[in-house]
Amino acid sequence: KASAYIFTNAKGYVTIMLPLVKQHKYHVIFYEEDGSELFRIKTIKDAELILDKTDFIHAGWFSFELFEDEKLKEKSKFFLSRD
C-alpha cells in the first residue's frame, strides 16, 4: 500500500506531506533496498517537503521509517525512477 505521507510525485520527486507538522515532531530515516541506512532527516518543520532525486544517488526501491513524537508512525517503501 502506498504511503499517504512519503511518496513520489508526478514529476518523480520524493514528497513528504505532514499536515500535522505543527502539532507533532517528525523525523524520517531512508534506507537502501538492502536495508542499509541511506540518510535521515532529523527534524521536519514544513507540511510539504520535496527532496531532489540526487539525494538518493540512484533509481530503484527505497524504504523509510517515519516517526511521530519518537514513535514509529509508518514503515513503507517507494520506487524512484530514472529521468
Predicted regions and their residues:
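Aromatic (tryptophan-biased) beta-strands that constitute blades/sheets of beta-rich domains
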Residues: F39-R40, E74
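Glycine-centered coil/turn sites that cap beta-strands in beta-rich domains
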Residues: A2-I6, A10-K25
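Short beta-strand/loop motifs in extracellular/secreted proteins, especially
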Residues: H24-H27, G60-F62
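Intrinsic-disorder/low-complexity, polar/charged segments enriched in Ser/Thr/Lys/Arg/Asp/Glu/Gln
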Residues: K11-T15, D46-E48, K73-K75
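A generic structural motif
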Residues: K42-I44, F79
